[in-house]
């Protein structure tokens, strides 16, 4: 080896340490180590697998940043986009085996999840699962269980979500530095319990998560805990306490400039005010929520705000409603169709337009059937 050339094995050990900081959401430590590794790569002996491993960790690093805090608050500049990193990884893949194959599929699943492409995410996760035997680190196994549990929840596969989140939680709770993940586990427990109509137990998880998030001083998690508590009350038709918690979520996100989380909370506040007949308040939140959806390039919530326009302000506009549903069908977002079709069915029922109401109740039933059928879609070969 030439003098001054750094062994790839030494850089590999640093990348492993970098990943430990990423998994514990230790942003400053992760940033420092990333910068050190970038310098060492310039003097490292050539190793194509190690370079791909670095690219994967850079990708995972960016996923952490995108979730946890806005970049402008962290004072981190010139971060590559996830789409750029994804293209770089795809272009550098060879015949991957073992642990690298696991990471490629696992991190790609996280990327697809971030785009709300849930079936695609689970498809990649299940490819990663085939290589899970190469993962000796029990924390990394917990990461896998946690991420696939999240995706199963969004596809309304409650049984599989709860099994995996229990596996993840039992590993994280034995550690001293994984409080962020423990908080997130409580979120996943809670939302699944809501789907089982066990609201009391769900609220316990959310309140415990809120207390932990406040202790950790993580604004994103505090806001998410408030949002989940609002959702818990909303699903029980307790609209006033639901709005109180959604407002707290909005206040937390806005004060910390966590704009990516705002469209979701604004949407439900807007919907509640429309349902209560408070159209002036609804219009105020509708306008701001739609602007946030556009600002953050959140096409899903932009379409949902357009749905509210079609239902409540355009007398209603059947073509606009169906345009929203077609968009959601194209993304296999049948859980969202179920929720929104139910809103339309109830609205028409209250207006005594029973034939239209019945047609949307049938759409609710069809969406539920599609959710039940969705498990087989995860086996698509990629």
UniProtKB/Swiss-Prot annotation:
Protein keywords: Competence, Cytoplasm, Repeat, TPR repeat
The record's listing under PROSITE patterns reads:
TPR, TPR_REGION
Q: Subunit arrangement?
A: Homodimer. Interacts specifically with the C-terminal DNA-binding domain of ComA. Interacts with CSF.
Q: Which InterPro entries match?
A: Bac_ResReg_Asp_Phosphatase, TPR-like_helical_dom_sf, TPR_rpt
User: Which cellular component terms (GO) are annotated to the entry?
Assistant: cytoplasm
Conditions for induction: Part of the rapC-phrC operon, which is controlled by the P1 promoter. Transcription from the P1 promoter is activated by high cell density through the phosphorylated form of ComA. RapC is part of an autoregulatory loop, and it negatively regulates its own expression.
User: Which organism encodes this protein?
Assistant: Bacillus subtilis (strain 168)
Tell me what effect the entry lists for residue 263 to L. Prevents inhibition by CSF
Name-wise, this protein is Regulatory protein RapC
| Recorded name of the encoding gene | rapC
Q: How is its activity regulated?
A: Inhibited by the competence and sporulation stimulating factor (CSF), encoded by phrC, which prevents RapC-ComA interaction.
